[in-house]
Amino acid sequence: MRYISLNTTIITTTETTGYGAG
């Protein structure tokens, strides 16, 4: 969901697992 997460591996992994970054 967050564009910043794309730059941050840790946040990306968290969102992908929990929110399902899309």
From Swiss-Prot:
GO biological process, one term: threonine biosynthetic process
Highest taxon in the source lineage: Bacteria
Chain segments annotated as transmembrane: none
Any Pfam family hit: Leader_Thr
Entry keyword annotation includes Cytoplasm: no
Keywords linked to the UniProt accession: Amino-acid biosynthesis, Leader peptide, Threonine biosynthesis
Keyword Amino-acid biosynthesis: yes
InterPro entries: Thr_lead_pept (IPR011720)
Function: This protein is involved in control of the biosynthesis of threonine.
UniProt similarity note: Belongs to the thr operon leader peptide family.
Protein name (Swiss-Prot/TrEMBL): thr operon leader peptide
UniProt source species: Yersinia pestis
Encoding gene, per UniProt annotation: thrL
